[in-house]
């Protein structure tokens, strides 16, 4: 059994029009959401062993902000193809993962990360999954090796909105 966490980056700032899309940082609201999501991840089993993030500033800040709350923070690897990635790009990365990894997180952007979640769970992009900023989808994949990942093989174990976490903690 493999576990895949799909985390959409936290709320980004639009206060700096001179910055490119890839350079936009998190907004204060986005930064505030990260410790709460980190606490949720700390309680999950199995723990996240590696994080692959889009190189966009807001995605890297999201990944690094979340792991500050973890007792055993995983390595965060910038993966340039994840910037505005589509389903085939996410799948290519998934197929390349080392088989010894049991739980991996991807930090990325819509619409691609949302589409990948739908493709894994429903076998197609259905438009029925909503990954808002700082929302986490936890998927179980009943596979032994990551290269076995196919359309519809995933089971959505939890969809965790950051607003719900704030209300609970």
Explain the meaning of each model-derived region:
Residues 152-169:
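Charged phosphate-binding loop/patch that engages nucleotide di/tri-phosphates or the phosphate backbone
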Residues 2-81, 89, 113, 127, ...:
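Active-site-proximal alpha-helix that buttresses catalytic centers in soluble enzyme cores
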Residues 102-118:
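A glycine-rich beta-strand to alpha-helix segment
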Residues 82-96:
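Short phosphate-binding loop-to-helix
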Residues 121-157:
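Domain-level recognition of soluble alpha/beta enzyme cores
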Residues 18, 117-120:
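Short, flexible helix/strand-to-coil boundary loops that buttress conserved ligand/catalytic motifs
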Residues 4, 103-105, 136:
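Residue-level preference for the first positions of well-ordered beta-strands
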Residues 44-46, 97-102:
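Glycine-rich phosphate-binding loop signature in dinucleotide/nucleotide-binding domains
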